[in-house]
Amino acid sequence: MEVLAKHRFARTSAQKARLVADQIRGLPVSKALEILTFSPKKAAVLVKKVLDSAIANAEHNEGADIDELKVGAVFVDEGPTMKRIMPRAKGRADRIMKRTSHITVVVADR
């Protein structure tokens, strides 16, 4: 049984979120939650929310036991980029890219 949860349009770049996702892939759910709880990265908070949601989905929809769940797959895809302008000296302007990402977590029983 596999259960998934998604967070779409998360306000972090996919590159930064993938650093966190790579740390928990394939781990038991309890160990993954510990790692995410104590990680100093902003993306860890977002990934933890999605993991909690996937666990709740498995419990509620499939009747799964939390102790037997592991992180089956975690992947982060790029979302749309918001483009903004930053005024600079002498009438110039720089483009600011505010990147978003789509975080997907799949939990499966061992």
Curated annotation (Swiss-Prot):
Pfam family, one: Ribosomal_L22
GO molecular function, one term: structural constituent of ribosome
SUPFAM superfamilies: Ribosomal protein L22 (SSF54843)
Biological processes, Gene Ontology terms: translation
Keyword Aminoacyl-tRNA synthetase: no
GO cellular component annotations of the record: cytosolic large ribosomal subunit
InterPro entries assigned: Ribosomal_uL22 (IPR001063), Ribosomal_uL22_bac/chlpt-type (IPR005727), Ribosomal_uL22_bac/org-type (IPR047867), Ribosomal_uL22_CS (IPR018260), Ribosomal_uL22_sf (IPR036394)
Matches recorded under CDD domains: Ribosomal_L22
Keywords: Ribonucleoprotein, Ribosomal protein, RNA-binding, rRNA-binding
Source domain of life: Bacteria
UniProt entry tagged with the keyword ATP-binding: no
Protein family: Belongs to the universal ribosomal protein uL22 family.
Description of how the protein assembles with itself and partners: Part of the 50S ribosomal subunit.
Purpose: This protein binds specifically to 23S rRNA; its binding is stimulated by other ribosomal proteins, e.g. L4, L17, and L20. It is important during the early stages of 50S assembly. It makes multiple contacts with different domains of the 23S rRNA in the assembled 50S subunit and ribosome.
Name assigned to this protein: Large ribosomal subunit protein uL22
Organism: Shewanella frigidimarina (strain NCIMB 400)
